[in-house]
Regions:
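Membrane-cytosol interface segments of multi-pass membrane proteins
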Residues: 1-155, 259-261, 271, 284, ...
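Alpha-helical transmembrane segments of multi-pass integral membrane proteins
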Residues: 17, 23, 86-89, 150-159, ...
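C-terminal ends of transmembrane alpha-helices
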Residues: 26-31, 94-101, 155-167, 211-226, ...
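Interfacial loop-to-helix transition and helix-capping segments at the boundaries
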Residues: 42-55, 108-123, 161-179, 214-247, ...
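Hydrophobic transmembrane alpha-helices of secondary-active transporters
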Residues: 56-67, 179-186, 277
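Alpha-helical transmembrane segments in multipass membrane proteins, preferentially the mid-helix core
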Residues: 127-136, 180-193, 244-260
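Loop-centered beta-sheet repeat module
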Residues: 145-191
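Alpha-helical transmembrane segments and terminal signal-anchor/GPI-anchor hydrophobic tails
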Residues: 193-274, 281-290, 296-310
């Protein structure tokens, strides 16, 4: 986390990315995608791509800033505390609401990063531990070499797209490192040609992903083929070249915005990660979407009513995150006044630096 003031275009992208992630989870975990083919279900097919698209944009943003940053182990400790804090809070809420939790849920919530309770934050921690090495590589070469490196890595994405179910050289961490490489190069290279066409690229790729999802759904329904239906969102997967291209388009569309520094936007952007931790805990997920949000009541609702409910969920999450985060930050300040912890942090930083 950097203290210096950031321009708000990337922070606005951070907010946008989290909103589309939440909406993607709304239609997926809320069960809207599993309903009969309808206007609401067609709209859900559009929102479905937001999850992986938003995560890809988040990694691009991180790389954009970290490529010129120094490693700080305190950030890792703060991130681990934040992840575990939210996991424990949610498991307590689940206990209150349902009356029971398992021993596994309790232990894994306390040590959430170790047990990979949240896949995205765990992969991010791994990426943060490695980013100084990637920075050395990126900073060593000129623009021509870096663009060539990106070109040579394109087949890595295509392999996963062409061979359904392939895990060739894939893990959440390796994919984040791959995306980090792209985001770092975006900061170092002149990308004006891409930037000029970025909005067109984003819209075109989003439409292609949407149409492919609808098309495969229709084919699957008509042929009663569950295999086709199960892969209807294949083009919206995080390894899809279309998702990467769409994320690149979205990234540069926001990058070229000239909105200066807006403190309101920057303040809201700080809540994006807490929003993620609040709504996508696998142990709390069913309670949240089924018992609190109750998406099933809006499966067949008027389209405008559905939109209003989605907006209410998004706003509610940001408000809840602001309250929980206010409490967490105060606990964090107490924790990091420990002289012993600060000595450990200093020693780790010396090893990296």
């Amino acid at each position: 986390m950097q203290n210096k003031v950031r321009n708000s275009n990337m922070e606005l992208l951070r907010i946008f990315s989290m909103i589309i992630i939440v909406l993607s989870h709304y239609v997926y975990h809320g069960g809207l995608l599993e309903q009969e083919f309808s206007t609401n279900q067609i709209f859900a097919q559009l929102l479905k791509m937001g999850g992986k698209l938003g995560v890809t944009c988040f990694v691009f943003i991180s790389a954009y800033y970290l490529i010129e940053a120094e490693f700080k182990s305190k950030n890792i400790f703060k991130l681990i505390f934040q992840i575990s804090f939210y996991a424990v809070i949610l498991i307590i809420i689940k206990l209150v609401m349902t009356g029971s939790i398992s021993g596994t849920e309790s232990v894994e919530s306390i040590f959430a990063p170790i047990y990979n309770v949240y896949w995205f934050p765990t992969a991010y921690i791994g990426m943060y531990l490695v980013f100084p090495l990637i920075n050395i590589i990126i900073n060593k070469y000129n623009q021509a070499c870096l663009k060539l490196v990106l070109l040579l890595t394109v087949p890595f994405s295509i392999i996963h797209f062409l061979f359904i179910g392939s895990d060739f050289l894939y893990s959440n961490l390796t994919w984040f490192l791959y995306l980090y490489l792209w985001g770092g190069v975006f900061r170092k290279c002149d990308m004006q040609k891409v930037e000029k066409k970025s909005t067109v690229i984003a819209i075109l790729c989003a439409c292609l992903i949407w149409v492919s999802s609808i098309g495969m759904t229709l084919i699957g329904l008509k042929t009663a083929n569950n295999t086709i239906l199960s892969h209807a969102g294949y083009c919206a997967d995080i390894t899809s070249p279309l998702v990467i291209a769409c994320a690149i388009g979205v990234f540069f569309t926001f990058k070229k915005l000239d909105i200066g520094c807006n403190r309101i936007i920057n303040s809201i952007a700080k809540l994006t990660f807490p929003v993620y931790l609040l709504h996508d805990n696998p142990y709390f997920r069913q309670v949240f979407w089924k018992d609190i949000v109750r998406v099933e009541k809006f499966y067949d609702a008027n389209f405008l009513i559905l939109l209003l409910h989605m907006a209410t969920v998004v706003v509610g999450l940001f408000v809840a995150a602001s309250i929980v985060e206010w409490c967490r930050i105060r606990m964090e300040k107490l924790l990091f006044t420990s002289n012993y912890l600060n000595r450990v942090i200093d020693k780790i930083d010396k090893v990296y630096l």
